[in-house]
Amino acid sequence: DEDGMNTLGFQEEPELERVLGATGFTVDTLTGRILESDIFFNAIFPWSVAQSGAAGRFDLESTAVHEIGHFIGLGHSAIGETELVGTGRRVTAKQAVMFPIAFPTGNISDRVLKPDDIAGASDIYPGGDFSRSTGSISGRVLLAGRGIFGAHVTAFSLASGRIVGGFTLDGEGRFVIAGLEPGLHVVRVEPLDDGDIDSFFSDDADVELDFIATTAPSLVSVPRGGSSGDVTIEVRAR
């Protein structure tokens, strides 16, 4: 409800059988400012607040960290791997708390922010040193000479192994990945195939999925406090 308060609490939502929690917003449509945000945790699931987690129970802190990411304006990250199990998906690995699918019960890994989460939050709310101490990679993803929308682009730091991702967000196939540590990065493009499309984009978004995952032909150097300059990656249809 719109009451001017930000509320966190438990609520039984049996029809949301795959949803551990959710965050709702009241947004000023003129400025984009978040006026109010409420978080609920689905009480139909077994929960735990044990320091080391508990077998058969979902970790409340991990889910809260994810939902608070939405609370401050973060969307979902696609840095994760899943496998199909029945009618759903099971996470096999991920490097972002903001990946849309939780680890199985007993896991507490998502209590700790990953580089992709930190880069996203810092991009929205930059500290005094953020823009000066990090850099970015920008460019385009092309399929048969045309830009594609919704491709997942990642930057992997050779120095630290940190991974930060982003998406192509227009019909020209343009992307920007900010919050990167200076140095050489491997840039990779892949289709969104480890989560439901509507976890990342609206139902009517024209997301391109029919292409082969591709790595940029050369390493990309990220300068401190600046941008790599445009990087063009050409992908092939599959």
Region annotations inferred by a language model:
Residues 1-91, 152-153, 166-168, 172-180, ...:
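Metzincin-family zinc-dependent endopeptidase catalytic domain
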Residues 34-38, 93, 134, 148, ...:
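Extracytoplasmic
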Residues 40-41, 119-120, 124-130, 231-238:
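Conserved "repeat-terminator" motif of extracellular CCP/Sushi domains
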Residues 110-135, 143:
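Beta-strand-rich domain onsets/edges
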Residues 135-143, 173, 233:
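A short, amphipathic beta-strand motif
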Residues 136, 148-152, 184-186, 230:
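Exposed beta-strand and adjacent loop surfaces of beta-rich binding modules
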Residues 139-151, 156-159, 223:
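Structural motif
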Residues 192-232, 236-237:
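Structured interaction patches on ligand/partner-binding surfaces of diverse proteins
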